[in-house]
UniProtKB/Swiss-Prot annotation:
Anything else known: Present with 2100 molecules/cell in log phase SD medium.
Protein name per the record: Imidazoleglycerol-phosphate dehydratase
Higher taxonomy: Eukaryota, Fungi, Dikarya, Ascomycota, Saccharomycotina
Annotated pathway: Amino-acid biosynthesis; L-histidine biosynthesis; L-histidine from 5-phospho-alpha-D-ribose 1-diphosphate: step 6/9
Binding site for substrate: 14, 64-72, 90-94, 116, 138, 186-194, 214-216
Induction per the UniProt record: Induced by histidine starvation in a GCN4-dependent manner.
Domain of life: Eukaryota
Necessary cofactors: Mn(2+)
Residues annotated for Mn(2+) 1 binding in this entry: 64, 91, 186, 190
Catalyzed reactions: D-erythro-1-(imidazol-4-yl)glycerol 3-phosphate = 3-(imidazol-4-yl)-2-oxopropyl phosphate + H2O
MF GO annotations: imidazoleglycerol-phosphate dehydratase activity; metal ion binding
HAMAP family, per database record: HisB
Note on how the cofactor is bound: Binds 2 manganese ions per subunit.
Amino acid sequence: MTEQKALVKRITNETKIQIAISLKGGPLAIEHSIFPEKEAEAVAEQATQSQVINVHTGIGFLDHMIHALAKHSGWSLIVECIGDLHIDDHHTTEDCGIALGQAFKEALGAVRGVKRFGSGFAPLDEALSRAVVDLSNRPYAVVELGLQREKVGDLSCEMIPHFLESFAEASRITLHVDCLRGKNDHHRSESAFKALAVAIREATSPNGTNDVPSTKGVLM
């Protein structure tokens, strides 16, 4: 397996994003922050001996979801985003999903010697979600969370599945994420991101060979 790290920058007229990722966790840093004088403090920040997670998108609940995804995937992750939040949350959420997907794909490298498929369940109180992923190079997303509110915090509920769809498209994976039950939209969303993390962690884990896990012989 390779070092499995990546640094991705995405700059458009709508957002400026920088993401560093290590799929194996461990120390991680960005040499030059996009924030002037480090003026923005991460809403979702955690540092342990095994992981460094620092997320600042400008949308608190999105930070919380990305933090949960990184934590339970076993990643170290730094996300910096300056977006046009004076308009709404669409561009920031979508572009963060795209950039994170690109970073994940680059860090993963060739799909070789890994399980490829992964599945996971995660509860959060009354909510229960299921996720299934395939590192297939066939981007597709089916996301059914059954959210009822207009927003959770400052994040529009319609953008929560859209983030996952953008991540799947950019990372070129297939993912199915369903919330099976739950009454609270915060819980439904968080259990979904945690279930996805469990599935990704399994799919990217070594399978004991150096083979490409495909009858085609290639996943590219």
